[in-house]
Every structure is written in structure tokens, then in C-alpha cells.
UniProtKB/Swiss-Prot annotation:
The keyword Isomerase does not apply. This is Autonomous glycyl radical cofactor. It comes from Pasteurella multocida (strain Pm70). The modification Glycine radical is found at residue 102. Residues 5-127 form the Glycine radical domain.
Length: 127
């Protein structure tokens, strides 16, 4: 749990009236503002503050947004027949460029297996 404090008494005079965030789970303190020995956003072990007295302050912490995973979209504006014809007649489509994993690639430079994979993944019957 994180709580905000203002140090009211301390052996180190530079800690007096300084503001900190205490993380009791990690045993750490983050300096919000202090004079002298500590700088803003410095993280120290709570034990480094020594013997202190403090008053608690209300802290409003916004939840952090975590984004995991996601999706990737490759847009190829082609007909299935065009790609199948390019597999059978590569000389007719020397400049045919498609998107694969975010990169532009010439369709004819792919292996036959990769070409079939592109066709299968691009043209599905349903989502």
C-alpha cells in the first residue's frame, strides 16, 4: 500500500517538512520534495530515512493502464484470383507488392509455402 507523508520530526534536519510516498510492500520511499540530501523522485529504502515522525496525507493515485497483447492488421486490396494467378504466372506480376507482418514485400520473392500461407490468411470464409 502506498501512503503520502510529510515528515514532522527527524534526526536529519533536511528531512523536516519534506514530502514522501511510502510503499510499505517494497519498503521504499519516493521523495516528492525535500531540501538538501534528497532530490525529487529519488527512491530510497525507508530505513535510510532513520527515526522519523510524520503525518499522513491523502493520496489519490490513478490506476495504471496496462496494455498487453494487441492486434496487427495488414491491408492488401487484392482479389484471391489475382494472387493465385501470380503463383501460377509470376512473370505477369513482377511488381506485385503485399504487406506481410507490417513490411512491404514482393509477392514473387516469397517461397511457394509463404505464398500459400498469405492467400490462406488473407482470404478466409469467416472471422
Amino acid at each position: 500500500m502506498i501512503k503520502g507523508i510529510q515528515i514532522t520530526q527527524a534526526a536529519n534536519d533536511n528531512l523536516l517538512n519534506s514530502f514522501w510516498l511510502l510503499d510499505s510492500e517494497k519498503g521504499e520511499a519516493r521523495c516528492l520534495c525535500a531540501k538538501g540530501d534528497f532530490v525529487e523522485d529519488q527512491i530510497v529504502a525507508v530505513s535510510e530515512l532513520g527515526q522519523i515522525e510524520y503525518r499522513e496525507l491523502p493520496v489519490d493515485i490513478a490506476p495504471t493502464v496496462k496494455v498487453e497483447g494487441g492486434q496487427h492488421l495488414n491491408v492488401n486490396v487484392l482479389r484471391r484470383e489475382t494472387l493465385e494467378d501470380a503463383v501460377n504466372n509470376p512473370e505477369k506480376y513482377p511488381q506485385l507488392t503485399i504487406r506481410v507482418s507490417g513490411y512491404a514485400v514482393r509477392f514473387n520473392s516469397l517461397t511457394p509455402e509463404q505464398q500459400r500461407d498469405v492467400i490462406t490468411r488473407t482470404f478466409t470464409q469467416s472471422l
